[in-house]
């Protein structure tokens, strides 16, 4: 799945990927590597190292005015990924908000043959770089690339011994404070890991591009995890010699143990990010010992890419609208028909539920309502009804055998007070049980049910419709299917507690203290009316499902009741 839409916001390739056809028409060296299919679509074989090298060199020349040479035996960098890293470093050091005339100093650990990070940083931002390299071939190519782009005054390439990271590289420049360091460490610990034999999930497809890196570029003792730990240990000695330390990671599983290492070492400022481009994802970790640095927020938890959510809908047939129009006469002075009468009844239901709503502008033959639900009142109504029935069931009654015995004989004055109480006539007892003393209030308001009605309410469990309103799971047409928020809802539940479990309580800590906001559209569809409910924002989409089901059931019950 392409990840280009998740690139850094300032990455020039985020919304405008390279135009291979245009580049091929302008650069003959690139043209020889492109392929054109029968539909005229231009493509590139990313498994061909020469094609990948041609693309990198062409993009640097076209978009940045840089001319470089890269040997096929060494790592060929992809431009969008490296540009993502440069932009993140800009965020770390506050480049966008700072005085552009201030000279920024950075270190590139293992700059590679292309020397791409210093070239991009110097060209885009005028940064000064100390670029280190252990490999002879990479060192020679890096120096050549710097010189042929006339950037020797901003980029210093130095050859360092094997396993040299920061400590030895900074011995000669003990007075300079650097703003940052960058590093693209060797990802793998051995050949098997580099080939994905013991590290790659077998379910993943094979890599779509070729790996051309040399031994020192792709492999190190202990892999990237141990390599970055060595940088961390160097930083513990250098501390404020650099404002920010950073490293790119090729494996997500390396991120957590490195963050834990920084925590154990007591590093005060830590952040991380994701680099997304094409079909490749990388991670980066940064830390600082300065108190005055601004720490960029890490990326929020990414959700699976989803199709746009369909609204929850149900249809009100023309025959139903006609019945609703007849019943709506007490509600309106003028006659209401069609979608107007459906909207009128929806507004009445919402008013009864105390759901805030107002009409908003919309298209022709359409009525729109904007809803703000403060509490889950549609569930409360059902709960109150069942609670009332339970209270009626629990009113004490005399046992049947006692009543029968009392009917057969009148009590004598010598009988116990309790028997006398039971023997009182109907005029001396309340209709619902024992007589009330003066000043006592009835426990249940309203008329008491008959024996028949009580037996009918013996099991006051929710009906199927009531369950559907509480559960929010009735499939109101097919568009309701799969409409729950999935991981988003689960996350919200973990943060605020489950809104459904709370049964309509206002959840603390929520701006405005509302459950959700949504938009109801009532549209004319031939002779019928289509009711759509669109999610806007809130705590849990299932609550909107419940309300939609409740409204639908109430409208249909209006017609069913004669």
From Swiss-Prot:
Comp. bias (Basic and acidic residues): 402-413
Residues modified to Phosphoserine: 329
Organism: Homo sapiens
Catalytic activity: adenosine in U6 snRNA + S-adenosyl-L-methionine = N(6)-methyladenosine in U6 snRNA + S-adenosyl-L-homocysteine + H(+); an adenosine in mRNA + S-adenosyl-L-methionine = an N(6)-methyladenosine in mRNA + S-adenosyl-L-homocysteine + H(+)
Protein name (Swiss-Prot/TrEMBL): RNA N(6)-adenosine-methyltransferase METTL16
Superkingdom per UniProt: Eukaryota
Region entry Disordered, spans: 402-498
Effect of residue 5 to A: Does not affect methyltransferase activity
Effect of residue 184 to A: Abolished methyltransferase activity in vitro
InterPro entries hit by this protein: METTL16/PsiM (IPR017182), METTL16/RlmF (IPR010286), SAM-dependent_MTases_sf (IPR029063)
Biological function: RNA N6-methyltransferase that methylates adenosine residues at the N(6) position of a subset of RNAs and is involved in S-adenosyl-L-methionine homeostasis by regulating expression of MAT2A transcripts. Able to N6-methylate a subset of mRNAs and U6 small nuclear RNAs (U6 snRNAs). In contrast to the METTL3-METTL14 heterodimer, only able to methylate a limited number of RNAs: requires both a 5'UACAGAGAA-3' nonamer sequence and a specific RNA structure.
The enzyme's E.C. designation: 2.1.1.348, 2.1.1.346
Gene this protein is translated from: METTL16
């Amino acid at each position: 799945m392409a990840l280009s839409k998740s690139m850094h916001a300032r990455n020039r390739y985020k919304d405008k990927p390279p135009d291979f056809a245009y580049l091929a028409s302008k650069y003959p060296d690139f043209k020889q590597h492109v392929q054109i299919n029968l539909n005229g679509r231009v493509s590139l074989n990313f498994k061909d190292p020469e094609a990948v090298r041609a693309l990198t060199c062409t993009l640097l020349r076209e978009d940045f005015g840089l001319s470089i040479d890269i040997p096929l035996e060494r790592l060929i960098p992809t431009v969008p990924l490296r540009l993502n890293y440069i932009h993140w470093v800009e965020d770390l050091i506050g480049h966008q908000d700072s005085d552009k005339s201030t000279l920024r100093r950075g270190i590139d650990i293992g700059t590679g043959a292309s020397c791409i990070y210093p070239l991009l940083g110097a060209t885009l931002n005028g940064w000064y770089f100390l670029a280190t390299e252990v490999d002879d071939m990479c060192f020679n190519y890096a120096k050549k690339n710097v010189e042929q782009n006339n950037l020797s005054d901003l980029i210093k390439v130095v050859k360092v011994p094997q396993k040299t990271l920061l400590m030895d590289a900074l011995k000669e420049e003990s007075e300079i404070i650097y703003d940052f360091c960058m590093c693209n460490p060797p990802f793998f610990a051995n050949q098997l890991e580099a080939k994905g034999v013991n590290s790659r999930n077998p379910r993943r497809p094979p890599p779509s591009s070729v790996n051309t890196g040399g031994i020192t570029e792709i492999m190190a003792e202990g892999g990237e995890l141990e390599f970055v730990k060595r940088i961390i240990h160097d930083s513990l000695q250098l501390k404020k010699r650099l404002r920010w330390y950073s490293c790119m990671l090729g494996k997500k599983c390396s991120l957590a143990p490195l963050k834990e290492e920084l925590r154990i070492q007591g590093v005060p400022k830590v952040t991380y990010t994701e680099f997304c481009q094409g079909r490749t994802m990388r991670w980066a970790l940064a830390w600082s010992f300065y108190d005055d640095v601004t720490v960029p927020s890490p990326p929020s938890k990414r959700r699976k890419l989803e199709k746009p959510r369909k609204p929850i809908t149900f249809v009100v047939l023309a025959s139903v609208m006609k019945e609703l129009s007849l019943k709506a006469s007490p509600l309106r002075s003028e006659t209401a028909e069609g979608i107007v009468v459906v909207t009128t009844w929806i507004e009445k239901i919402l008013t009864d539920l105390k759901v805030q709503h107002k009409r908003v502008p919309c298209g022709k033959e359409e009525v729109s309502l904007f809803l703000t639900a403060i509490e889950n009142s549609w569930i409360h109504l059902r709960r109150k009804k069942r609670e009332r029935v339970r209270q009626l069931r629990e009113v004490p009654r005399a046992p049947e055998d006692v009543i029968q015995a009392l009917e057969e004989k009148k009590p004598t004055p010598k009988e116990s007070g309790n028997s006398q109480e039971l023997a009182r006539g109907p005029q001396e007892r309340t209709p619902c049980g024992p007589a009330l003393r003066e000043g006592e209030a009835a426990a249940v308001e309203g008329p008491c049910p008959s024996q028949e009605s009580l037996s009918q309410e013996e099991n006051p469990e929710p009906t199927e419709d009531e369950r559907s309103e509480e559960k929010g799971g009735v499939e109101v047409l097919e568009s309701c299917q799969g409409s729950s928020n999935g991981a988003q809802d689960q996350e919200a539940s973990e943060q605020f507690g489950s809104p459904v479990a709370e049964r309509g309580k206002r959840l603390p800590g929520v701006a405005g203290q509302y459950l959700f906001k949504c938009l109801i559209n009532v549209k004319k569809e031939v002779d019928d009316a289509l009711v759509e409910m669109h999610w806007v924002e809130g705590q849990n989409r299932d609550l909107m499902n419940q309300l939609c089901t409740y409204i639908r059931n109430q409208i249909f019950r209006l017609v069913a009741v004669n």
